[in-house]
Amino acid sequence: MTKINENVAIQFVKGENEKDQPEIRLFRNLDGKKGKAVYKFYKPKTITLTNYKSVQRMFLIDSEGVLSTKKIDLSISEDHVKEVKSTYNWNSEEEFERFMRFASRYANSLSQN
């Protein structure tokens, strides 16, 4: 299992870094200002059947601070959380650049371990 740098993390439960590595897809409008990143976690570790109702945000944490989104969809089976899909939106070039700095740090933290 890949160890994630503690300074860069994704959290659904405050204080608990998600260990599952997401699939991430980026979408941008033609004008380049608005867009979104769609995260899919196929085996989330921090979201369980006992705490999934309390999960309300995805937090993207790095040295600059915290980005967050409330757009979270869960796929649940009888005995576990199967998939988490979360969407982070940006509405300006500055917000996109900030997101990309987080994404770069997150990717680098995974490749260093």
UniProtKB/Swiss-Prot annotation:
Membrane topology: Peripheral membrane protein
Subunit structure: Part of the photosystem II complex.
Gene3D superfamilies xref list: Photosystem II Psb28
Annotated localization: Cellular thylakoid membrane
Domain of life according to the entry: Bacteria
Hydrolase as UniProt keyword: no
UniProt family annotation: Belongs to the Psb28 family.
Main subcellular localisation: membrane
Keywords recorded for this protein, A-Z: Membrane, Photosynthesis, Photosystem II, Thylakoid
InterPro entries: Psb28_c1_sf, PSII_Psb28_class-1
Entry coiled-coil feature ranges: none
Protein name as it appears in the record: Photosystem II reaction center Psb28 protein
One of the protein's GO biological processes: photosynthesis
Any one Gene Ontology cellular component term annotated for this protein: photosystem II oxygen evolving complex
